[in-house]
């Protein structure tokens, strides 16, 4: 399978002097997580949310100048290898000058299966970021920044009751909410798709692909939350075990 078969051609650009809050609005209205920034830069929704207390600053202050390209004729597995080795979640598709599209880790996860002899417990993050429902969103964002993650699992009395993502927090910012006065349960997702430690990794991949989600909590019936598998974890496993 070639990159051109799974890439998105919905690549939107924004001026470098646009405000961070305006870039958040563009992402949410177009249901995307990345924007090209004129002048050879790219910015992600994580970059924008991490700057929650600087919303009137220009996008260029948080954008990345390191644009990574892949040829549209390259195999999809090659794009996964590049993303994993470079620690990025997307690649521009093109010749290094002209942008034809973008391919993301989520596109790859939807396209490539992983060996069924691998269990969720084999690759899960055994120390996922957690929070409680009455924490402020500002507190959660700062924890996310410390752990360089896009999600926090919301727990109560040992049970998983929700997930809060940078996209959820972006919605709060777009609604002009003060994150210091806004609680997690006002914007968290309560529809939680979770897996068991002994579920196959392929089953978890299918959960991600089917439900278009970026993280799956791993829940043991006796112990409760024991880990999580995010897109970056899954991508690394695909690189080694795809078929």
Where are the model-predicted features located?
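Tandem CBS (Cystathionine beta-synthase) repeat/Bateman regulatory domains
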Residues: 1-243
């Amino acid at each position: 399978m070639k990159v051109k078969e799974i890439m998105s051609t919905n690549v939107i650009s924004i001026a470098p002097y646009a405000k961070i809050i305006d870039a958040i609005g563009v992402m949410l209205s177009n249901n995307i997580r990345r924007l090209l920034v004129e002048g050879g830069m790219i910015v992600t929704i994580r970059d924008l949310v991490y700057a929650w207390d600087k919303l009137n600053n220009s996008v260029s202050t948080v954008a990345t100048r390191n644009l990574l390209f892949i040829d549209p004729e390259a195999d999809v597995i090659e794009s996964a290898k590049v993303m994993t080795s470079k620690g990025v979640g997307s690649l521009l598709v093109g010749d290094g000058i002209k942008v034809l599209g973008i391919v993301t880790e989520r596109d790859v996860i939807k396209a490539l299966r992983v060996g069924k002899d691998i269990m969720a417990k084999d690759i899960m993050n055994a120390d996922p970021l957690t929070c409680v429902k009455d924490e402020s969103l500002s507190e959660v964002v700062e924890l996310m920044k410390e752990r360089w993650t896009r999600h926090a699992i919301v727990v109560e009395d040992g049970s998983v009751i929700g997930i809060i993502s940078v996209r959820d927090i972006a919605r709060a910012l777009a609604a002009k909410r003060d994150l210091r006065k806004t609680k997690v349960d006002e914007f968290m997702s309560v529809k939680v798709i979770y897996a068991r430690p002994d579920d196959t990794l392929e089953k978890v991949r299918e959960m991600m692909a089917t439900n278009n989600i970026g993280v799956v909590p791993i829940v043991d019936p006796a112990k409760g939350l024991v880990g999580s598998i995010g897109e970056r974890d899954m991508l690394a496993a695909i690189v080694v075990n795809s078929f």
